[in-house]
């Protein structure tokens, strides 16, 4: 009975984590597009937002403050013994993955970038197996394969051979995506190591990774001079400050659920949730805007739901209890 109650509690917690990540990052995506793709000013003086590093810097600061509040109210009696260099390494790989992914958009189109990032569970699993000697049940491999394949099919769009304008060979963009995926895997390995050896709490993980990220990004935007251009831009268009703060708040809430998922279920489950979140966001867009779904996309839909269902039922069969 106790085991059944524990499984029920774990299932409810996983559902809360999934819904938290989905809702927060659904609005996060809308705000991100509003900020980065919107035009500011009128007539010939219209400007675009060009300060990606500064935006992430504000985001990391708010994340760290939010995590500090959570620790103050919920984890004040818990001592964190995780070594600082692990947080620093994890933040470097995390930032490197973000920068590589965003830079790839200069060379490949957005669907290619999203499709590449949808394979994130693969490096998390491969590096977990090779570096940490971690063992996953065969069912976990099959679930990840089904989910990645389903997302890939859903996002796949046949190339229009008649247009001829979107042709490109394997180059810098694809290499940057591979680098981003590798760094994603290293981030997952670092988080797994912290959980296994130091029982790192989700709020402490969120606080210190974002503090280190803020330190690295702060040095970067001061060194490049982007900080002063960003502040000048917000002075010219003060309305953007509201969107940036709301964007950062949804990021902080989303990261709370992400780190909670990492601590209780591991980085692989977290990567599965974040990958399928993209799928559900696109699916919601299709429903809301009445966009047609092709037969291939319906196959992808079925595969994703099948993978999620099988993972919930069999994916944790040999997993040891979390401390």
From Swiss-Prot:
Which GO BP terms, alphabetically? transmembrane transport
What SUPFAM superfamilies does the record point to? Multidrug resistance efflux transporter EmrE
Classify the source by domain of life. Eukaryota
| Motif (Di-lysine motif) on chain | 319-323
For this protein, the parts annotated as crossing the membrane are 15-35, 51-71, 85-105, 136-156, 169-189, 205-225, 253-273, 286-306
Q: Keywords, A to Z?
A: Endoplasmic reticulum, Membrane, Sugar transport, Transmembrane, Transmembrane helix, Transport
Q: How does it sit in the membrane?
A: Multi-pass membrane protein
What is the annotated localization of this protein?
Answer: Endoplasmic reticulum membrane
Per the database entry, which stretches of residues form a coiled coil?
Answer: none
- Does Transmembrane helix show up as a keyword for this record? yes
One Gene Ontology cellular component annotation?
Answer: endoplasmic reticulum membrane
Q: What is its main location?
A: endoplasmic reticulum
UniProt key word Transmembrane helix: yes
Q: Which InterPro entries match?
A: SCL35B1-4/HUT1
Spell out the family assignment given in the record's similarity comment: Belongs to the nucleotide-sugar transporter family. SLC35B subfamily.
Q: What is this protein's function per UniProt?
A: Probable sugar transporter.
Know anything about its domains from the record? The di-lysine motif confers endoplasmic reticulum localization for type I membrane proteins.
PANTHER family (UniProt xref)? SOLUTE CARRIER FAMILY 35 MEMBER B, SOLUTE CARRIER FAMILY 35 MEMBER B1
Q: What is this protein called?
A: Solute carrier family 35 member B1
The gene designation is: slc35b1
């Amino acid at each position: 009975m106790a085991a059944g109650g524990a499984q029920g509690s774990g299932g409810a917690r996983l559902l809360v984590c999934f819904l938290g990540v989905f809702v927060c990052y659904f609005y996060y995506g809308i705000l991100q597009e509003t900020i980065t793709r919107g035009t500011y000013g009128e007539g010939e003086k219209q400007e675009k937002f060009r300060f990606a590093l500064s935006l992430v810097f504000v985001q990391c600061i708010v994340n760290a403050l939010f995590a500090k509040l959570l620790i103050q109210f919920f984890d004040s009696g818990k001592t964190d013994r995780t070594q600082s260099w692990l947080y620093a390494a994890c933040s470097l790989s995390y930032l490197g993955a973000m920068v590589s992914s965003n830079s790839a958009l200069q060379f490949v189109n957005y669907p290619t970038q999203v499709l590449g990032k949808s394979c994130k569970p693969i490096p998390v699993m491969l590096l977990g197996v090779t570096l940490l000697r971690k063992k996953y049940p065969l069912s976990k491999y099959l679930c990840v394969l089904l989910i990645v394949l389903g997302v890939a099919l859903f996002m796949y769009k046949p190339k229009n051979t008649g247009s001829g304008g979107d042709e490109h060979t394997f180059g810098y963009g694809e290499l940057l995506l591979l680098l981003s995926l590798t760094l994603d895997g290293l981030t997952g390995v670092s988080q797994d190591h912290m959980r296994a050896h130091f029982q790192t709490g989700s709020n402490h993980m969120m606080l210190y990774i974002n503090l280190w990220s803020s330190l690295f990004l702060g040095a970067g935007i001061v060194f490049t001079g982007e900080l002063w251009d960003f502040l000048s831009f917000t002075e010219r268009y003060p309305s953007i400050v509201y969107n940036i703060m709301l964007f950062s708040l949804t990021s902080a809430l989303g990261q709370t659920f992400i780190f909670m998922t990492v601590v209780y279920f591991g980085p692989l489950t977290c990567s599965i949730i974040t990958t399928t979140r993209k799928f559900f966001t696109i699916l919601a867009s299709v429903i809301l805007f009445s966009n047609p779904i092709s037969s291939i996309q319906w196959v992808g839909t079925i595969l994703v739901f099948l993978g999620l269902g099988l993972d919930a039922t069999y994916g944790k069969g040999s997993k040891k209890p979390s401390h």
